[in-house]
């Protein structure tokens, strides 16, 4: 997709900033990231588009919180979204930020005359967000993902999160797995499973 490729530009100058900022976030949140979690948060500072995948208990939520904190430090306006109301509610509870369904984000309505779904947010009226994080990407089909891409301004940072091994979306296309297999987009694989008591990160004494 040309619109996705247009978002892929990376800012190599952000590397040092990212390392320093990730260390700040660890101190502020009182945690020490596992190596791949740290890599993911740092990558978000410079990647136009990135994929974050991992199974249950691998620390995706902790990593997403770190990415949100990073974007906040960068002064970016952030939108959190998920394909279902349940997933959006869970995302909101775990990050402490409002999250909404992708359909609501795009202003989805049903056009009775055309007998098709229409979206308020498009190239002509794009989203204001400078960074968009989408969770449960394995549940997103081709049509919805294409609509989301059309609604993004050039230069918007896009973070796609999910479990590539999860059952694919009901609609057409296994978007998330296909993006990972393409090897065209920076991808971080979280494989280490943390104990629940660790809350998906290595908790340390912050004092």
Where does each model-flagged region fall?
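Conserved ATP-binding/catalytic motifs of P-loop helicase motor domains
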Residues: 1-207
């Amino acid at each position: 997709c040309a619109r996705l490729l247009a978002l892929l530009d990376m800012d190599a100058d952000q590397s040092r900033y990212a390392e320093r900022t990730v260390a700040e976030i660890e101190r502020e949140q009182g945690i020490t990231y596992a190596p791949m979690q740290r890599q993911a948060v740092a990558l978000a500072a410079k990647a136009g588009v990135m994929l974050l995948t991992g199974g249950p208990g691998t620390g995706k939520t902790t990593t997403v919180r770190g990415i949100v904190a990073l974007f906040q430090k960068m002064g970016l306006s952030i939108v959190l979204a998920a394909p279902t109301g349940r997933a959006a509610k869970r995302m909101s509870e775990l990050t402490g930020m409002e999250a909404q369904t992708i359909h609501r984000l795009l202003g989805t309505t049903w056009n009775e005359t055309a007998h098709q779904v229409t979206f308020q947010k498009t190239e002509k009226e794009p989203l204001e967000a400078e960074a968009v994080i989408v969770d449960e990407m394995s549940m997103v089909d081709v049509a919805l993902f294409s609509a989301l891409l059309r609604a993004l301004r050039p230069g918007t940072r896009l973070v796609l999160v999910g479990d590539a091994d999860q059952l694919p979306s009901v609609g057409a296309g296994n978007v998330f797995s296909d993006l990972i297999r393409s090897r065209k987009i920076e991808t971080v694989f979280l494989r280490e499973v943390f104990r629940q008591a660790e809350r998906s990160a290595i908790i340390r004494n912050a004092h």
